[in-house]
């Protein structure tokens, strides 16, 4: 009877050892997958890229709309080029803000150090979420600002002395792009390393 308890204990020890080995192999296999190894970095880069790309798309569309309206006016009155140019450039600031968020995010990730950082999935999602305000805010505010700038060019065409009122209207939309920039920057600053 005394030998049996020791055999049962040995079997339990072997079983625990096998289970531990299997668990370690599973963890190793899971960490070797793309998402396990690089998922956090991939999510973070996706967020940073979206901030730059979507803001840039919005700025391109916004400045394009304002440029189309400005081209019509400049055919009739080339002397208004300076004022038209100012109104056309205003929707382009969101692209710049998106690039600032992209640069700040990759700086905080540690990508500028020369080596690839190891970010957890949670950190990757934090970067993605932090970059979304600028990505979406930049996209939609730049398009809206382009429409306002195009309308302001119509003000310049009909009442040249009142063109500054159109600038004030454009700056009102700019305020929300600045809020998007601020939200993204504050969120990125608070991501733990």
Regions inferred by a protein language model and the residue ranges of each:
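Hydrophobic, small-residue-rich transmembrane alpha-helices and their short perimembrane loops
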Residues: 18-193
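Single conserved hydrophobic/aromatic residue that forms the stacking wall/gate
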Residues: 1-16
